[in-house]
């Protein structure tokens, strides 16, 4: 397994036997048709390094997209929360649809990295962190890695009206990633 850390100087790879600085960008990795092969090639003769004490989120120019209502318990909770607004049947249509509920979450400059605080909306009374398995998908649609994510949600805003989802989910520092891409 290779762990990739990002810092102000670029990428650091940690394998079972070494820690090295890579001559590689995350953008190049995400654009590669075979990120694993590119990474293994760049590991050869790479200079030694140390794991950063203050890393960055493992993304460069990539957008974060998320999938909503991914399990039954989530659907049930959302239905209950939006019942007063008449939105309880809305989630039946989302959960049973052919197309998944995908939504835009953040651009890189709006993402909290390791050790950085996420933010909450001032106009919300019920803000919830949602731990996520975050997939790294290259430009050809191949999953080549994963990291830990945090998807902050203003549940009272979403519950008021399901169409308020962007307001409940998309704001500065509403997402966090890292510390490493595996």
Describe each model-derived feature in a short phrase.
Residues 11, 19, 143:
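Short, mixed charged/polar active-site loops
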Residues 15-42:
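N-terminal cap/recognition module
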Residues 37-182:
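Active-site microenvironments in enzyme catalytic cores
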Residues 9, 28, 101-102:
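Short non-domain terminal segments
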Residues 1-16:
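N-terminal basic/disordered segments at the start of proteins
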């Amino acid at each position: 397994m290779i762990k990739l850390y990002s810092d102000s100087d670029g990428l650091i790879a940690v394998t079972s036997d070494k820690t090295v600085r890579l001559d590689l960008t995350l953008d190049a990795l995400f654009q590669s048709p075979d990120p694993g092969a590119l990474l293994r090639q760049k590991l050869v003769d790479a200079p030694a390094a140390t794991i950063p004490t203050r890393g960055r989120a493992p993304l460069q120019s990539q957008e974060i997209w998320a999938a909503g209502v991914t399990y039954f318990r989530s659907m049930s909770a959302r239905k209950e929360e939006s019942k007063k607004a008449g939105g309880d049947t809305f989630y039946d249509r989302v959960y049973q649809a052919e197309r998944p509920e995908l939504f835009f979450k953040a651009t890189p400059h709006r993402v909290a990295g390791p050790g950085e605080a996420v933010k909450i909306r001032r106009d919300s009374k019920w803000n919830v962190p949602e731990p996520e398995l975050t997939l790294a998908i290259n430009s050809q649609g191949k999953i080549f890695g994963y990291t830990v994510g945090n998807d902050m949600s203003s549940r009272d805003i979403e519950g008021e009206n399901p169409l308020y989802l962007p307001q409940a989910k998309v704001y500065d520092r509403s997402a966090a990633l890292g510390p490493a891409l595996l």
